[in-house]
Amino acid sequence: MSPAKKSRSFPPISECKSREYDSIAADLDGTLLLSRSSFPYFMLVAIEAGSLFRGLILLLSLPIVIIAYLFVSESLGIQILIFISFAGIKIKNIELVSRAVLTRFYAADVRKDSFEVFDKCKKRKVVVTANPIVMVEPFVKDYLGGDKVLGTEIEVNPKTMKATGFVKKPGVLVGDLKRLAILKEFGDDSPDLGLGDRTSDHDFMSICKEGYMVHETKSATTVPIESLKNRIIFHDGRLVQRPTPLNALIIYLWLPFGFMLSVFRVYFNLPLPERFVRYTYEILGIHLTIRGHRPPPPSPGKPGNLYVLNHRTALDPIIIAIALGRKITCVTYSVSRLSLMLSPIPAVALTRDRVADAARMRQLLEKGDLVICPEGTTCREPYLLRFSALFAELSDRIVPVAMNCKQGMFNGTTVRGVKFWDPYFFFMNPRPSYEATFLDRLPEEMTVNGGGKTPFEVANYVQKVIGGVLGFECTELTRKDKYLLLGGNDGKVESINKTKSME
């Protein structure tokens, strides 16, 4: 028989003494997170695991959700969000989105004062939330350092492994169900501390030895992302900003105009000579910044320069061609035939056979300049992945170029999505910008043939130089690391296609 509930009032978290606790139970929305609403995160699941159409249905249903939440029950409002966002989606896709997309948005929303209290707990940190466990568990464990999540469990069809849109018994974890979950988890040893932000949290806070309310205040701030338990290096998803109701409305109002603008930006510039495109970009609202000395084209009979870039989007080689004002060949992995056909510059697909690829690139360098991105994949955050050393074996005429871009509404890269649409999403941004900084050609003493350096030394040196210019941190992470985290595969074309065919 469970203990009777106690009627208590709780002091604000500002009165919580700076001391360590052995165990803590804390709510998520409005407590550990600054935002009290879980709508943006359900919207992300609806769009990224479902579709833009599902996201639109969720947005249009928001008035019904609010009415149900305020005038019927908190549980019903959340059930509606879950049904629209989850119904018919494979649970594996929801898990991938939770790990690859939601963590970045959750991490940017962590409330400083409550996280500091939560983090001081020495032994047992539990998050109790009305949100589905599948949504929040990767974030809570990997970035908050939580030990367990007590939340709503999603019902899954065992035959199709798709979410039904309903929840398992006892239902959405709110009010007294949170209290019962805490009692089941902790038994007679109640948590030392309970944190909540609303009246329905009083039920579980009342059985904690101490309880504090996290009130909504203008002075509340978020924790710097680098202060969390892990760094956010890789993330996926098309949306740049957290889709609050207002942001989501703006996105859907902009979508038809943005798509038409994107198509015009792509195909208007496609037939134009590269030396003119820089100016048409500015006219069409695309800001291009070019810095450093741009080498002239190679003289007849001489090998070309090897331009080595960090990789931000699939547009990197095209930006180099525009900056140089001439056609330039690029090599790439994981690109469709249609993308190769529509590319405004010559693009050669590599095979990941080291010997064959090296021979092919040497042939291309004999004919002219060549662009290569040795990271092998894009990275959105201010980090550089490990540079493959193959490029250092090909030429001593190496020109590093530091690339960066800004996107305000949509991300022009994806792991789980269709890569063909990457440039279109980039150009759907109202005012996208790109920066290319040409660095000095590598001195002879820093090359393989002229200076006796190993290919790995050259690759690490180029990575360090580019990272220094951009202010990015150099890492040893690879394409495989990124795709295993975000896509559940090793990043090879055949693996990606196999993963998608199973979805």
UniProtKB/Swiss-Prot annotation:
GO terms for molecular function: glycerol-3-phosphate 2-O-acyltransferase activity; phosphatase activity. One of its GO terms (cellular component) is membrane. Widely expressed at high level. Highly expressed in seedlings, developing seedlings and flower buds. InterPro entries: HAD_RAM2/GPAT1-8, HAD_sf, Plipid/glycerol_acylTrfase. Pfam families: Acyltransferase, HAD_RAM2_N. The HXXXXD motif is essential for acyltransferase activity and may constitute the binding site for the phosphate moiety of the glycerol-3-phosphate. This is Glycerol-3-phosphate 2-O-acyltransferase 4. It comes from Arabidopsis thaliana. The lineage of its organism: Eukaryota, Viridiplantae, Streptophyta, Embryophyta, Tracheophyta. The gene is GPAT4.
